[in-house]
From Swiss-Prot:
One of the protein's GO biological processes: poly-hydroxybutyrate biosynthetic process
Quaternary structure (record): Forms a heterodimer with PhaE, which may multimerize in the presence of 3-hydroxybutyryl-CoA. Both subunits are required for PHB synthesis in E.coli and in PHA-negative A.eutrophus.
Organism: Synechocystis sp. (strain ATCC 27184 / PCC 6803 / Kazusa)
Main location: cytoplasm
Cellular localization per UniProt: Cytoplasm
Protein name: Poly(3-hydroxyalkanoate) polymerase subunit PhaC
Domain AB hydrolase-1 as annotated: residue spans: 84-356
Recorded family membership: Belongs to the PHA/PHB synthase family. Type III PhaC subfamily.
Pfam families linked to this entry: Abhydrolase_1
Summary of the function given for this chain in its UniProt record: When expressed in E.coli with Synechocystis PhaE and C.necator PhaA and PhaB, confers the ability to synthesize up to 13% (w/w) poly(3-hydroxybutyrate) (PHB) depending on the carbon source; all 4 genes are necessary for PHB production. Cell-free in vitro coexpression with PhaE gives a heterodimer able to polymerize 3-hydroxybutyrate-CoA.
RNA-binding keyword on record: no
Remaining remarks: Nitrogen-free medium induces chlorosis in Synechocystis, leading to the degradation of the photosynthetic apparatus and concomitant accumulation of cytoplasmic polyhydroxyalkanoic acid (PHA) granules which in this cyanobacterium are composed of PHB.
Entry keyword set: Acyltransferase, Cytoplasm, PHB biosynthesis, Transferase
Length: 378
């Protein structure tokens, strides 16, 4: 730190000399960068783990089963809409992405619009969870959470809001238990996994080509799939941008503590990836990515068949136009497999996958779109 202060002081002293030899502009750029960097280092030195807070919206745990916790967010209007909304997030990341930062929280915005919002936290699987299956997650944990919400709200049905992989899970659940789902909202949810142009699908094995990973070998050898492995998979989809380029911009924001904290919150979420229960990972990768069974009507959850034609409830399909993880075509395919005369609505947003949660513009437009759509279907 002392060396950097010395460099700044020396550059200021040498400014007249550099001006004489025509390097004044270059010197000013170097000086500005160094001063910004110094200010940023001071901000970083004053931060600790507790400062990088996520999940700002007040909530209470209303049910727990094994490592799974069901939360209810504290309503902020006197009379919320009667049909509760359950957010079903993916297994591969932590659900606080929907409540990552103040001012851009999907949850907080939905609450302000009068919704009664619940959230499932799947927790962190341990070695003892290696044999958990999709049946355990969907017909077990998820179904039990739905029952608890119905009891608490005195409603026979609820609204599911499934996000990413959680959207795929919600489609499966609503197919198996249509009598418990009043409305279904899916957001950036993969449906047709046979999209070779999408790198995540190729790595998952949708073409079963040279890039396809050997799922059976992985699960048999490791049991649970490490979250660090999944982090690497996601980073390698855009290695230059995600592993290098974004960090070049950090000195520009280090002097602004609010921007720096938002960046660190995102970094915390990106690398906070739970391990995946081995058998669940095996079935999801093989049945969905490698064999595309969802749109073929061949997915089995236990001894029950998932049939998208069972989705007779109103459906809102939200997707990101610039999504590099879930291709728009993958999400849009849902409309081709629904029953005739289904109340089906599609809406897109001009952002990428993560932008659906953190873009300021999307958070101005997305929650009202969901709330308005639901208010017409109570």
């Amino acid at each position: 730190m002392f060396l950097l202060f010395f460099i700044v002081h020396w550059l200021k002293i040498m400014l007249p000399f550099f001006a004489q030899v025509g390097l004044e502009e270059n010197l000013h750029e170097t000086l500005d960068f160094t001063e910004k960097f110094l200010s940023g280092l001071e901000n970083l030195q004053g931060l600790n783990e507790d400062d990088i807070q996520v999940g700002f919206t007040p909530k209470e745990a209303v049910y727990q089963e094994d490592k799974v916790i069901l939360y209810r967010f504290q309503p902020v209007v006197e009379n919320p809409l009667p049909i509760p909304v359950l957010i079903v997030y993916a297994l591969v990341n932590r659900p606080y992405m929907v409540d990552l930062q103040e001012g851009r929280s999907l949850v907080a915005n939905l609450l302000k619009l009068g919704l009664d919002v619940y959230l499932i936290d799947w927790g962190y699987p341990s070695r003892g969870d290696r044999w958990l299956t999709l049946e355990d997650y969907l017909s077990g944990y998820l179904n039990n959470c739905v029952d608890i919400i119905c009891q608490r709200s005195q409603q026979e049905k609820i609204t599911l809001l499934g996000v990413c992989q959680g959207g795929t899970f919600s489609l499966c659940y609503a197919s198996l238990f249509p009598d418990k789902v009043k409305n279904l909202v899916v957001m950036v949810a993969p449906v047709d996994f046979e999209q070779p142009g999408t790198l995540l699908n190729a790595r998952g094995g949708c073409t079963l080509g040279a890039e396809a990973v050997d799922i059976d070998l992985m699960v048999d050898a490791m049991g649970n799939i490490p979250g660090d492995y999944l982090n690497l998979e996601f980073l390698m989809l855009k290695p230059l941008q995600l592993g290098y380029q974004k960090y070049l911009d950090v000195p520009d924001i280090m002097g602004d503590e609010a921007k720096l904290l938002n960046f660190l919150r995102m970094e915390k979420w990106i690398f906070d990836s739970p391990d995946q229960a081995g058998e669940t990972y095996r079935q999801f990768l093989k049945d969905f990515y490698q064999q595309n069974k969802l749109i073929k009507g061949e997915v089995m959850i236990g001894d029950r068949l998932v049939d998208l034609h069972n989705l007779t409830m109103p459906i809102l399909n939200l997707y990101a136009e610039k999504d590099h993880l879930v291709a728009p075509a993958s999400s849009l395919a849902l409309g081709d497999y629904l029953p005739e005369n289904c109340d089906y609505t599609v809406q897109s947003f001009p952002v990428g996958h993560i932008g659906m949660y953190v873009s300021g513009k999307v958070q101005r437009d997305l929650p009202p779109a969901i709330a308005h759509w639901l208010s017409e279907r109570q």
